[in-house]
From Swiss-Prot:
Catalyzes the reversible conversion of 3-phosphohydroxypyruvate to phosphoserine and of 3-hydroxy-2-oxo-4-phosphonooxybutanoate to phosphohydroxythreonine. NCBIfam families: serC_3 (TIGR01366). One of its GO terms (cellular component) is cytoplasm. GO terms for molecular function: alanine-glyoxylate transaminase activity; L-serine-pyruvate transaminase activity; O-phospho-L-serine:2-oxoglutarate aminotransferase activity; pyridoxal phosphate binding. Its EC number is 2.6.1.52. It comes from the Bacteria. L-glutamate binds at residue 46. HAMAP family: SerC_aminotrans_5 (MF_00160). The modification N6-(pyridoxal phosphate)lysine is found at residue 196. This is Phosphoserine aminotransferase. The lineage of its organism: Bacteria, Bacillati, Actinomycetota, Actinomycetes, Mycobacteriales.
Amino acid sequence: MTSTPIIPADLLPADGRFGCGPSKVRPEQLQSLVEVGSSVFGTSHRQKPVKDVVASVRSGLADLFSLPEGYEVVLGNGGTTAFWDAAAFGLIREKSLHLTNGEFSSKFASVAKNNPFIGDPIVVSADPGSAPEPVSDPSVDLIGWAHNETSTGVAIPVSRPAGSENALIAIDATSGAGGLPVNVADADVYYFAPQKCFAADGGLWIALMSPKALERVAEIKDSGRWTPDFLSLPIAVDNSSKDQTYNTPAVATLLLLANQIDWLNGKGGLDWATSRTADSSSRLYQWAEASEYATPFVTDPAHRSQVVGTIDFDDKIDAAQVAKILRANGVVDTEPYRKLGRNQLRVGMFPAIDPEDVSQLTKSIDWVVSQLG
């Protein structure tokens, strides 16, 4: 093939962004930066204009997730990567248990293992593309797993394992929050970042924390454990109660996040969002199951994610070449997770992505593959 094929316009999605984070940002979100930005950009994050944005985020999330009584919306800078360290310092009393089945679910386990103030964690692993069964152990005081493993497209429902009464349930919902069904009462810490379902930039973490989790934060603080201020959950809880962050936040991220939360709530809340991602994912998986050359990577339909779809290709088809041609035609970020090393495409299907665009994507892929033959 000497030149890049041009996909017919009637096969292309209206918006070609299918990344798994950062993800598609709606035009209305960008417009909101222009409309309200002049009143908050370049102003103190300790004063009312920016604090009102933070308050909008916190109250909007409380509505979106039907936050149980006593739960708090806590936020801080640094994204989920920083929160893993904050949790190791401020939520694990002595020892944790982690379910791992991919790159991101393994990271919290690694952080816990390397923290000098707590014991080595118990790690229950499953191969990429599959899901470990949530379990408990009487020796642990925190159990954690990923609601959605972004690298592989595996979703594990949120629940309290039998025998876990004395442990916090900490769910990494970085790519699942806002796009997968959840009853937040089934977790003590449901934490995430804005660049997936919430269609904003990264660099912020948000945690929905139960009274039990807040008590643990206070308990560990009172124990005198040393913690860097940037990773201090007591400081984050205190600042969040005042609609602030410990250090200066990226205001654009907060504005994009606030607008997306308002949009989701205005459309019908979490029920609407999850029905939309279910629609998108059913289109992708049904196409792959009917295809002669593609198949869902996650073999168990019960664990196929509604927000991140991974599709394996027959060895005769070079998925990397397909992604390259798609990108040249404005359909971007369908490449697989780099460390997984599979001949596949990975498709983000967050609420901002129109299900019709997912259908158009499958048509574009079929056309590209026909040209490669």
